[in-house]
């Protein structure tokens, strides 16, 4: 019987995410919040919800709930775009900066603990294999 690699990878992602969520709980944030805030920081200022959804790799309706939560927490603001009233621009608030630093510290320390005992060469090898798997999957997906 062949190795259930897909199941193993899915389980790894699930437990990694659960640990991140557990460690972000004192900040009343989740990994989904962190990924969203991280991408807002990486994109040029005041990106649209559509651009943010594309950067994260999710559909815009899936993003709206997370943005609602971040807005309720006072970490972002959204305003209507002057050129396209259907589009909303996203901006981090001043109070988001210290929270983002704290979240990044939690994420970085957790990642370091998870990777403890694994060499840089092993990490690079794993990253290369994951990239090959992703490439193969995308090629198969695009063929069908």
Swiss-Prot record:
MF GO annotations: DNA binding; DNA-binding transcription factor activity
Residue span(s) of domain HTH marR-type: 2-135
The keyword Transcription regulation belongs to this UniProt entry's keyword annotation: yes
Keyword Zinc appears in the UniProt entry: no
Coiled-coil residue spans: none
Domain of life: Bacteria
Keywords in alphabetical order: Activator, DNA-binding, Repressor, Transcription, Transcription regulation
Known DNA-binding region: 49-72
Role this protein plays: Transcription regulator that can specifically activate or repress expression of target genes.
Sequence similarity: Belongs to the SlyA family.
PANTHER family the UniProt entry points to: TRANSCRIPTIONAL REGULATOR, MARR, TRANSCRIPTIONAL REPRESSOR OF EMRAB OPERON
Protein name per the record: Transcriptional regulator SlyA
Designated gene of the protein: slyA
